[in-house]
Amino acid sequence: MIQSHVSVMLNKMLEALSPKAGESYLDCTFGAGGYSKAILESCNCYVTALDRDPNVIKRAEEIQQNYGERFDFVETNFAGSFAKLKEKKFDGIVLDLGVSSMQLDIADRGFSFLHDGPLDMRMSGQGLSAEEFVNAAEAKELADVIYKYGDESFSRRIAKRIVEYRKTARIDSTGKLAEIVRSSIGFRKGKIDPATKTFQAIRIYVNDELGELEQFLVNVKNILKKDGRLVVVSFHSLEDRIVKNFFKENSEKPVVRSKYAKDDMTIDPNKWLKIITNKALAPSDKEVGLNIRARSAKLRAAKAIYE
């Protein structure tokens, strides 16, 4: 059964973003529109939404009908959005790095190990597909990708099984790949589906999700106004590490002049962020109980103190 999309950590996102009337916000990962709609409903503000998935355009049009000129949609990946946004700046920017239910639950999109469909996994429908990668990559490359992007300790065993299977038939469906992974490591009672980490790893690799995130963060200063807030919700340790390190590297640190003096801030325009969340925020147990996909989510936020 296809689930309706539930936005993860919605209230904590709104609290961190703190939308205000008359201000403009950028939703970098529109998906089903949960964040955009919540921001628009929070006050009389403006939202520009981005997504490289052409399948979300219909949903964007529905929101535009309800909110008129307060909402604008641009079909693009967020790393490549700077040229399309031109010189526009925003009072707040939010990124939800998870995959929406619209993608996971529709078999034809090829993301889900629960719904058999063509092995695709491409957000935009362009570039290398999961099928092409899985059937062409050597065992070492497969194992490296599954380990690096999926934290899968059985990556070599899975890669070996994939290569063995390819000798008899092409791996062209999500169902085939899921069964190959499951047969490699087996089910463990009470644990997540054995295919979870492998599917995550291949999806991240095929869509260059980490590279896109890094490229966006390098340039985000150019589109965030002074006092504007940057909120990122991640679902993978590598994503969270990238965001954490970016915030740390670009934030000012207090300098103690003496034990009697208060902390003072160095003035360095390259240190242009102030971290709002001292540590990553996690969803409540209640939210995870209602939406299991929220279990690995982490939210970090920072504010621009210089332009």
UniProtKB/Swiss-Prot annotation:
S-adenosyl-L-methionine binds at G33, G34, Y35, D51, F82, D96, Q103. It comes from the Bacteria. It catalyses: cytidine(1402) in 16S rRNA + S-adenosyl-L-methionine = N(4)-methylcytidine(1402) in 16S rRNA + S-adenosyl-L-homocysteine + H(+). Keywords: Cytoplasm, Methyltransferase, rRNA processing, S-adenosyl-L-methionine, Transferase. InterPro entries: RsmH (IPR002903), SAM-dep_MeTrfase_MraW_recog (IPR023397), SAM-dependent_MTases_sf (IPR029063). GO terms for biological process: rRNA base methylation. One of its GO terms (molecular function) is rRNA (cytosine-N4-)-methyltransferase activity. Signal peptide: none annotated. Its EC number is 2.1.1.199. It is found in: Cytoplasm. The keyword Cytoplasm applies. GO terms for cellular component: cytoplasm. It holds the Pfam family Methyltransf_5. The keyword Cytoplasm applies. Belongs to the methyltransferase superfamily. RsmH family. HAMAP family: 16SrRNA_methyltr_H. Specifically methylates the N4 position of cytidine in position 1402 (C1402) of 16S rRNA. This is Ribosomal RNA small subunit methyltransferase H.
